[in-house]
């Protein structure tokens, strides 16, 4: 309808000028429905059958609710992820997203820390943070933290390259997706280990 209006040189406000046959029929139908419901309500409220009708409506509502509950008990529920066979694509997609969130949190934490320190004149420098880090953490903890960030960075960097390959409409078949997935795992192992040894 909007394409026809454009051809005629009209905009959407032209619809408001003259009601169509459809809108007139819809308005007539809704007014008939309103009139019927009002008449029925008036009849029942003035009728001696009011109590009987009310009781019948209550019984019908209870019976209807019981039928609905039986139907709901048989209705299939939305399946949980645990019923599916795990796929390489899930894990890599999840790791790609989680790695960005974790690295982003670390980045913003230190950025805010240094920004607030400069504003408040606390004199926080990278040298002081480095000294505190090496004094408070054991070598195993240092390697764990460094390894976590090294591998998180490696998998996110590799995932970004993988997405750039997909953006060129390459490796979009199932075999191609798995091929790039296994390449990403190998790339992550190599780059993460290299970053850990720095």
Curated annotation (Swiss-Prot):
Give the way it sits in the membrane. Multi-pass membrane protein
Organism (species): Saccharomyces cerevisiae (strain ATCC 204508 / S288c)
| Effect after changing residue 153 to V | Decreases quinone reductase activity. Little effect on complex assembly
Task: Note the effect listed for residue 96 to A/D.
Answer: Decreases quinone reductase activity
* Pathway annotation from the record: Carbohydrate metabolism; tricarboxylic acid cycle
Q: Which Pfam families match?
A: Sdh_cyt (PF01127)
Q: Which residues bind a ubiquinone?
A: 93, 97
Q: At which positions is heme bound?
A: 156
The misc remark on file is: Present with 238 molecules/cell in log phase SD medium.
Q: How does it assemble?
A: Forms part of complex II containing four subunits: a flavoprotein (FP), an iron-sulfur protein (IP) and a cytochrome b composed of two integral membrane proteins.
What is this protein's function per UniProt?
Answer: Membrane-anchoring mono-heme cytochrome b subunit of succinate dehydrogenase (SDH) that is involved in system II of the mitochondrial electron transport chain and is responsible for transferring electrons from succinate to ubiquinone (coenzyme Q). SDH3 and SDH4 form the membrane dimer that anchors the catalytic dimer formed by SDH1 and SDH2 to the matrix surface of the mitochondrial inner membrane. Electrons originating from the catalytic dimer enter the membrane dimer for ubiquinone reduction.
Which cysteines pair up through disulfides? They are none
Q: Which residues lie on this side of the membrane: Mitochondrial intermembrane?
A: 121-139, 197-198
Which family would the database say this protein is a member of? Belongs to the cytochrome b560 family.
CDD domains (UniProt xref):
SQR_TypeC_SdhC (cd03499)
SUPFAM superfamilies in alphabetical order = Fumarate reductase respiratory complex transmembrane subunits (SSF81343)
Q: What is this protein called?
A: Succinate dehydrogenase [ubiquinone] cytochrome b subunit, mitochondrial
Task: Enumerate the InterPro entries for this protein.
Answer: SQR/QFR_C/D, Succ_DH_cyt_bsu_CS, Succ_DH_cytb556, SuccDH_FuR_B_TM-su
Kindly give the PANTHER family that the UniProt entry links to this protein.
SUCCINATE DEHYDROGENASE CYTOCHROME B560 SUBUNIT, SUCCINATE DEHYDROGENASE CYTOCHROME B560 SUBUNIT, MITOCHONDRIAL
Q: Which prosthetic group or cofactor does it need?
A: heme
Q: What is the effect of changing residue 156 to A?
A: Decreases SDH cytochrome b content
The listed locations are: Mitochondrion inner membrane
Co-factor remark:
The heme is bound between the two transmembrane subunits.
Q: A biological process (GO) annotation for this entry?
A: cellular respiration
> Which Gene3D superfamilies does UniProt cross-reference here?
Fumarate reductase/succinate dehydrogenase, transmembrane subunit
The organelle transit peptide extends over: 1-50
Keywords in UniProt for this one?
Electron transport, Heme, Iron, Membrane, Metal-binding, Mitochondrion, Mitochondrion inner membrane, Quinone, Transit peptide, Transmembrane, Transmembrane helix, Transport, Tricarboxylic acid cycle
